[in-house]
Curated annotation (Swiss-Prot):
This is Uncharacterized protein YraJ. Residues 1-26 form the signal peptide. Keywords: Signal. InterPro entries: SH3-like_bac-type (IPR003646). It comes from the Bacteria. To B.subtilis YraI. SMART domains: SH3b. Residues 30-104 form the SH3b domain.
Amino acid sequence: MTKLKMLSMLTVMIASLFIFSSQALAVQYFTVSTSSGAPVNMRSGPGTNYPIMLSIPSGSRVPYYCYAYGTTVTGKYGTSNIWDQIQWKDSRGVVNIGYVSDTYVYTGSDGPVGYKCN
C-alpha cells in the first residue's frame, strides 16, 4: 500500500471520529413541570427510593442526558417507570446531575428518548 493511500485512509478514519463523537455529545433541553406548579424533585437515582437532592421550579428548561428505568410514577405526562438524567444549577451556582421522573419532563414522547444511561 502506498504512503498516499495509507495517509488518505487515516485521514478519513480520524475525521469520522470527530463527526461521531460530536453527535454523541449533543445535549437536548426539555421542560420539567407539574400540573399544580409545585417544584419537581430531583433524586440521586432513578426511583422514589433514592434521596431527594433538590427541587426544580416547575416550568424550568433543563439539559437532558439519558434515561434509566426505575420506580413507576404517575405525573403530569402520564404513568411511567422511565427516569430522565438531567442537570440543574442551584442558587449557589453548583451544578447537580440527578434523575427526574419522565412523567414530569416534556420530551414529546411516551417512551424513552435518546440514550440509556450506563
